[in-house]
Each structure stands twice: as structure tokens, then as C-alpha cells.
Amino acid sequence: MRDPVSSQYSSFLFWRMPIPELDLSELEGLGLSDTPTYESKDSSSVGKMNGQASGTEQKNPEGDPLLEYSTFNFWRAPIASIHSVDLDLL
């Protein structure tokens, strides 16, 4: 069985750099300060921010300017366009 103390230091999560805290004042210059903040995967949510969207709003964020970058459709390859002339040849 692996020793939990020594395996702790050999893991990727121990040695990676922590993700820096997001400064909301920097978002004001980008025009994104009024967007809802999203809940972290941690269910404890000790550091919830004011103005955070509720669970139903997070599941259906209509009008979110960053939504197109967080969906599967943005990252997949575009669908090839087929013209009617090409379909007639098939």
C-alpha cells in the first residue's frame, strides 16, 4: 500500500501553481463586470461573491457574453457546408 504522506508530494496537484484569485476591478475595463459569477465545483462555497447567480440562472444563462466560449459548439470543428449542386451529384 502506498504511503499517503510521500505520495502527496509526488502528485501533480501538489506541485502545480495555484490559480490566481480573479480581481474583479480588472473586469471593469473589459466590460465584463456585470456578468454573473459562476459557482465553483466545491460544494462548500465558503467564498461566495455578492451578486452570484442562483442555480437556475447558472443552468440557463441567457445573454451571457462568454457563453459561446464555454460550450461544446465553440470548440468543435465547423460543419462542412454542402451546396445543392453537390447534393445533386450524389
Curated annotation (Swiss-Prot):
Q: List the record's Gene Ontology CC terms alphabetically.
A: centrosome; cytoplasm; cytosol; nucleoplasm
Q: Which UniProt keywords apply?
A: Cytoplasm, Cytoskeleton, Nucleus, Phosphoprotein, Ubl conjugation
The primary location reported for this protein is nucleus
Pfam families xrefs: WRNPLPNID
The entry's note on the tissues where this protein occurs is: Detected in embryonic brain cortex.
Q: Which GO terms describe its biological process?
A: extrinsic apoptotic signaling pathway; intrinsic apoptotic signaling pathway; positive regulation of apoptotic process; positive regulation of DNA-templated transcription; positive regulation of mitochondrial depolarization; positive regulation of release of cytochrome c from mitochondria
**Short motif Nuclear export signal, span:** 24-32
Q: What induces it?
A: Up-regulated during neuronal differentiation (in vitro).
Region entry Disordered, spans: 31-64
Protein's job: Cofactor for the transcription factor TCF7. Involved in regulation of lymphoid development by driving multipotent hematopoietic progenitor cells towards a T-cell fate.
Q: How does it assemble?
A: Interacts with HSPA8 and LAMP2 isoform A; the interaction may target MLLT11 for degradation via chaperone-mediated autophagy. Interacts with TCF7.
Q: Which family does it belong to?
A: Belongs to the MLLT11 family.
Q: What name appears for this protein in its UniProt entry?
A: Protein AF1q
